[in-house]
Amino acid sequence: MYTKNEILELKNRIIQLEKENKTLHETVEFLTHKLFGRSSEKTSVIAGQINLFNEVETESKPSAPEPTLREVANYRRKKFNGQRAELLKDIPHDTVICGLEEDERFCEKCGTSLVSIGREFIRTELEFIPAKVRVIDYYRESYECRKCRKEGLPYIEKSPMPYPVVQHSMASPSTVAHIMYEKFVDALPLYRQEKEWESLGVKLSRTTMSNWIMVAARDWLIPLTKLMHQKLIEEKYLHADETPVQVLMEPGRKNTSESYMWVYSTYAGSQTPIRLFDYKPSRSGNCPQKFLKGFKGYLHTDCYSGYNKVPGVIRCLCWTHLRRYFVEALPKDIKSPEATLPAIGIDFCNKLFSEEKLLVNLTPDERKMKRLETEKPILEVFWSWANSIKQSCLPKSRLGKAVDYAVKNKEGFMNYLMDGNCAISNNLSENSIRPFTIGRKNWLFSGSPRGAEASAAVYSIIETAKANGIEPYSYLKFLFKSLPGVQFEAHPEFLEEYLPWDPWVQSSCKKKA
């Protein structure tokens, strides 16, 4: 027979094992969803859940009589004839006249020659013209003064030449810009570009293309990103994020080691939008501390503790990130009782985001006042709710982690209320880094630290161009055509007029409407 203490101990053990089993079951569900489920974080209304905010829906009366229906005659959807014209207005047009051959222009009744009486429009086609390449051979003209020559003082002058984008190569501004655009915008790896060039009749190896990218980035793009870095530090509101990247041939590290690409962005209302990528071999907090040296202001991030090393900043944490924790806490069966608490957490976040949408067109001061009026009460209820359920949540469960994540970082989640220019989320930074994560799926790794640094510079230029509303390919081509020959090493101020918000750059590289 068991003693009372042994029975009590066994009961406690059973309770502990049940909790562990529940946590493990939840983990298996979560990982299975990660592998095979949809990646969208959109959530539908959960049957039976307590919705704190949809008062109209919860107070409605299903038994109320429906309004009488009125029959509407069938109709055909109206064609919007202007849409096609607007779509094709900036594309060159050719006209094809379909007429009768000379020997067919006769009347079948009497044999008299036919005369054209006009033409009618039939249709429009969009024709695709494959890419083509051409070779440009540069010759330099030399000029001589015949008079000086006769006097024994020969004078010869040679015409100026455009500087090459890559010395001692056949690379042109358009070629290097195209290779970069394909790799860093369209996420097309160099080995696939190699095949494309071969189909055009050019045997251009991926090694050559890689060298062109690194040299062009080193000579023309990195100096510009350094100037952007100086501008970034002067801002008052920044966003930051980081993502893993595998880099080969790092000194003293295995090729399987994980490195990081950090991205720093100005806030949505900045007059000089900047997106800067920074490759570092680690995720240490020393990385943002060094990069953001001199910055004082609001820093939007997730809850990663490494950002705590950045001195003199007020951290604004991301509510989208917190919402993601509650979404991940939803069980597979969203109609189960276990779904109620995560759903309430999601509802709180959704309500905050709904309120934010109403504040987009307000001034910063108006936005701050409105947030304190409408969002702060929601936040107070949220923190009260989170604290009330914290003790009842299994610490290792998804819901327990979500609640703990929120409560431990309450101050950071509330800081966006301090200034109307602050954002409720770090979506801006996540959107900036997304092209890199998409590209990483295709090219998998960087071949060397130099290659990773070049990639960071190219991504910085491309994403900053997008943020400033200009075409990335046009901007790259513009830089490679204009910067060679500019003495910016001796006069760094010369680079100012090549920044993407400069009126000259804007007019030269603007996107087609």
Each PLM stretch: what is its role?
Residues 104-105, 142-144, 149-513:
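Catalytic center-proximal scaffold of phosphoryl-transfer enzymes
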Residues 1-170, 210, 239-240, 301, ...:
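Short, flexible loop/hinge motifs at secondary-structure junctions
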